[in-house]
């Protein structure tokens, strides 16, 4: 199965990409209520990699270059008539990339989403091969209302984010905040640092509502996704009538 993946690396370092021993991370993560629960002993821990994700097909891509930014729009579709749009914007004056994910129901029946990622990154670290033990550090910020963020750094192995001997069971760390307090327990931020190659991938969510970040690993590659808190974590779902469209917050 062909999978469209977003792989971000520092400028000029693409020649050092070595990863070919892990599954590609789909560009968009989504789950519908009619989907079966995730496999690989991961039920109740994650809603990623649903049957819906496995049926997504590439439907085209455009790139527009402006004076101040580059906008790359990628289209995906699935057999139920859902059309997904992933918009990646790279700004000339900002080192951060912006991702916007939306879905439109082009079919004749209503469908209910119970998870939709705002962004997802995978194959971390693309500069490593094999398990690469003790080289991935996870950075999070613990905080609450009217408090300073406290940096917590843990090895991926300390969070049980390492594959089994057969790379079958999937492990996940899902965290965030439920309710209108965007910071209650954690700041909507997470970073994965490759200490062997001096590269860090960091992401932040921006909505003032329930949110989540999720670290996921089944094989040698680590994935990081985030956005709206899903149905399991934040009791969220969204029904799309025929012709309706929904855009996940940044």
Q: What kind of feature is each model-predicted range?
A:
Residues 238-250:
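Short Pro-Gly-centered flexible turn/kink motifs
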Residues 222-232:
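Short, structured beta-strand/loop micro-motifs enriched in basic residues and often containing a Trp
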Residues 1-219, 234-236:
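Polysaccharide-binding surfaces and accessory modules of carbohydrate-active proteins
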């Amino acid at each position: 199965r062909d999978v469209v993946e977003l792989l971000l690396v520092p400028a000029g370092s693409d020649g050092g990409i070595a990863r070919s021993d892990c599954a590609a991370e789909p560009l968009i993560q989504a789950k519908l209520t009619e989907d079966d629960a995730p496999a690989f002993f991961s039920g109740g821990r994650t809603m990623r990699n649903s049957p819906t994700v496995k049926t997504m097909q590439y439907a085209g891509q455009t790139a527009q270059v402006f004076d101040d930014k580059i906008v790359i729009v990628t289209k995906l579709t699935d057999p139920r008539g859902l059309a997904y749009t992933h918009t990646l914007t790279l700004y000339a004056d900002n080192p951060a990339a912006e991702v916007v994910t939306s879905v439109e129901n082009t079919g004749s029946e209503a469908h209910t989403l119970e998870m939709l990622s705002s962004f997802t990154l995978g194959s971390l670290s693309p500069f490593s091969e094999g398990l690469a033990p003790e080289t991935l550090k996870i950075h999070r910020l613990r905080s609450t209302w009217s408090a300073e963020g406290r940096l917590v750094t843990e090895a991926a192995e300390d969070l049980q984010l390492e594959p089994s001997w057969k790379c079958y069971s999937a492990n996940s760390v899902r965290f965030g905040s439920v309710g209108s307090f965007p910071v209650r327990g954690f700041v909507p931020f997470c970073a994965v640092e490759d200490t062997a190659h001096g590269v860090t991938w960091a992401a932040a969510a921006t909505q003032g509502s329930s949110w989540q970040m999720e670290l996921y690993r089944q094989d040698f590659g680590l994935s990081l996704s985030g956005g709206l808190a899903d149905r399991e974590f934040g009791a969220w779902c969204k029904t799309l009538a025929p012709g309706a469209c929904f855009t996940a917050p940044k």
